[in-house]
Amino acid sequence: MSSRAAVFILNQNAKREQGRKAQTANIKAARAVSDIVRTTLGPKSMLKMLLDPMGGIVLTNDGNAILREIDVAHPAAKSMIELARAQDEEVGDGTTSVIILAGEILSAVESFLERDIHPTVIVGAYFQALEEIVRLTESYGEPIDIENENDLQKIVSSCIGTKFSSKWGNLIVDLAVKAVKSVYKKEGDYVEIDVKRYAKVEKIPGGLLEESVVLDGVMFNKDVTHPGMRRYIENPRVVLLDCPLEYKKGESMTNMEFTKEEDFKKALMMEEEEVKKMCAEDILRVKPDVVITEKGVSDTAQHFLLKYGNCTVIRRIRKTDNNRIARVTGATIANRPEELQESDVGTKCGLFEIKKIGDEYFSFMTKCENPKACSILLRGASKDVLNEIERNLHDALGVARNVMVNPKLVPGGGAIEMELACRLMEFSQKIEGMQQWPFKALAGALEVIPRTLAQNCGADVVRVMTELRAKHANDKEGLYWGIDGNTGKIRDMRESNVWDPISVKQQTLKTSIEATCMLLRIDDIVSGIKKDKRGGAGQRGGDRGQGDQEETFGDQRDG
C-alpha cells in the first residue's frame, strides 16, 4: 500500500499567521505606530529627530512627516502610515489624531477578541456608531462667515498653534489665508480651491522668516536666455508656448546627403528662414514683451526675437509653472506659434522683473489683476527650519481651504471627542445584545484625544479627565469644555478660541473607524519571500528530479 507524499501549496519560506494570532499582531503593530506619534499632539508636543536614508536630518512634530520617514516591516503598520498620508492629502490636518485614534480603537477591541466575540459583530457595532458620530458632529457644527478675514485667521491660528511656526505669531496664518483667498474660485455653486496646483511654495535659504510673503502673482527659478534681454518690464504682454522655438526636426531619424557646397548652404538658409518666419511672422505678429516656452529656444530664435521685437525669452519652464502663469496673466498656452491670436496674449500682469536672490536668478510676475494663482516665498535661516515651516504652512493651507469649502466649526481641545464619547455611552444603553460592548469600547477610545493632550503637558490626567466627564455629563451643556493644551486644565474653548474645521474632524473620525474595521476583518497574513529571490526559487524548482514531490505554485507563477 503506497502512502501519498504531502503537497506544499505555499512556499516553505513563506511566513503565515492566521485567526486570532493575525488579529493580535495587527493590533500590536497599530498600537506601536500610534505610540510613536502620541507625544506630538497638542501645543506642548515634542519634536522628533529622524535620519533619512540620505543622511539628512528631519526635525518635525507633523504626524505624516514622521511616519513618512519611518521604515516599517509589518503590513498593518504600513496601512496605518497610509492612513496619515490619506488624511494629509484629503484635509491637510489631523494626521496625528487619526493615528492615535485608530490605535486606541483597535486596542479596545483586543478584549472582545479574547472573549471570542466575532469580528463581524464588532465591525457592525462600529459602523452603527460611526453613523451616530457623523450625525452628532454635524449637529454640533457652528457656521461662520468666511468673508470675515479676522475670523478665518483666528481659526487657522488655533489649528496650527501646536506647530513649530507658532513661535512667529500670525505670520504663517496670514500667509495661508492670503494664499487660499488668492486661489479661491467660485462659479455658481461650484467652489474650486486647488492649493496643491495653484499655490506654489518657493523656499530660499537666507534672510529673515519675517521676509516671507505671498506674491500677487508668481515666481519661478529661471533667468533670461540672452544677456541683452530686458529684465524689468511694466505691464508686459505675455505669450505662453508649449513648443520648441527651433528648426523642426523629423519625428524619426533623418539623414541628409549633400553633393555640393551650395546645397549645404541652402539647407542652412532654409533652417534660418523657417526660424525667422516662426519668430518674426507668427510670434511678433501679436507684439509680445515676454515669451515663455516649456521647450527649448535656439540661438537663432533668440536673436530674431531680440532684434525685431525686443522680447524677453524664458525657456524650459515646468508645465505646472506655465499653468500658474496662465492663471495670473490671463494668457492661453499655445501649442503652435502659427496659432497665436490676440486673445491668447496675457495682459493682466503689472510687472515682470528678474531678481538675484543669493546665488540664483528668479523671475517675478507680480502686481497681477485678480490673480487666481500665487507663489508663497519663504525665507529662513536654514533648510531644516524652512522644511518645517513649509510643513506647517501646508497644514495651515489645508485648514483654511476646508473652512472655506465647508464653513462650519466644532470646538477643539478634545471637547468634541469627549462630548461624542458621553453621548455614545448614553446611546449604547438603547442597544441590546452583544453589540452594546463594542459601542461602549468605542466611546471610551474617543477619550484618548483629551487624555493625550493632558498627558503631553504634564497634567494630573485622572483628575482632569474626571472633571471633563462631569462637564459633558448632560447633552450639549458642556460641549465647549475641553483641555487647554498649554496648562493642562479644563477650559471653555470659546474663551481660548480653539476651533477645528468640521471637515477635518469628520474625516479624522471616519478614517480611523473605517481603518479599524478593515484591519479587524483580516484573519490571515501571508508574507512570502522577496521578489529578487523568486527567480532563483523558480530555477531550483526546475532542476529537481522527478521523485521530488514538493510543489511550489505561489513562487513560480510570476517568475
From Swiss-Prot:
Pfam families for this protein: Cpn60_TCP1
Chain spans, region Disordered: 531-559
Record carries keyword Nucleotide-binding: yes
UniProt xrefs under SUPFAM superfamilies: GroEL apical domain-like, GroEL equatorial domain-like, GroEL-intermediate domain like
Localization in the cell: Cytoplasm
GO function terms (MF aspect): ATP binding; ATP hydrolysis activity; ATP-dependent protein folding chaperone; unfolded protein binding
Covalent S-S links between cysteines: 368-374
Keyword Disulfide bond belongs to the record: yes
Keywords from the UniProt entry: ATP-binding, Chaperone, Cytoplasm, Disulfide bond, Nucleotide-binding
Any Gene Ontology CC annotation: chaperonin-containing T-complex
Main location: cytoplasm
Assembly and interaction partners: Heterooligomeric complex of about 850 to 900 kDa that forms two stacked rings, 12 to 16 nm in diameter.
NCBIfam families in UniProt: chap_CCT_gamma, thermosome_alpha, thermosome_beta
Function noted in UniProt: Molecular chaperone; assists the folding of proteins upon ATP hydrolysis. Known to play a role, in vitro, in the folding of actin and tubulin.
Family affiliation: Belongs to the TCP-1 chaperonin family.
Protein name: T-complex protein 1 subunit gamma
